Regions:
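ATP-dependent carboxylate-amine ligase catalytic core
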Residues: 2-13, 17-111, 115-141
Length: 142
């Protein structure tokens, strides 16, 4: 069973494309995927549902809190063959852009999900290693 959080260093990095591709592959393999989106975003879950025919639900730590988000995750993801959660903005970008509260990192930490980073490597090489190291070392666990 696949359970993971797809995130990125910033918006526009390919999270939704990667999430949709992974959900389509899981569905094609008969793994009954369920999708989640961090925060109140309604557009990406619409892609998950309309384009792929995959159930998609929001996980909003700001509006629902940790206990309710855990309950929603179990309610909609329990018994599914695979779960793909998609972050919003950058991995650590939470409320107001000044905290990691309600971020993809906070959601992944709350649900004990491993992360998969999307990114645009154009025009960079060794700098990518520094960015990856920074993303993995900024908070514990990461």
């Amino acid at each position: 069973m696949v359970e993971l959080m797809i995130s990125a260093p910033a918006s526009g990095s390919g999270k939704t494309v990667l999430a949709c591709a992974l959900l389509a592959a899981l569905k094609d393999r008969g793994l009954d995927p369920c999708a989640f989106k961090c925060g109140p975003d309604y557009i990406d879950p619409m892609f998950h549902r309309s384009a792929l025919g995959v159930d998609s639900h929001n996980l909003d730590l700001f509006l629902a809190g940790e206990d309710r988000v855990r309950g929603l995750y179990r309610r909609y993801g329990g018994g599914r063959g695979s779960i793909v959660a998609e972050g919003a903005m950058g991995f650590y970008d939470g409320l107001g852009g000044t905290t990691d509260r309600a971020s993809a990192w906070h959601t992944a930490h709350t649900l004990d999900l491993p992360g998969l980073m999307a990114g645009r490597p154009k025009g960079a090489s060794l700098t990518l290693a520094a960015q990856i190291r920074g993303l993995t070392a900024f908070r514990t666990p990461s």
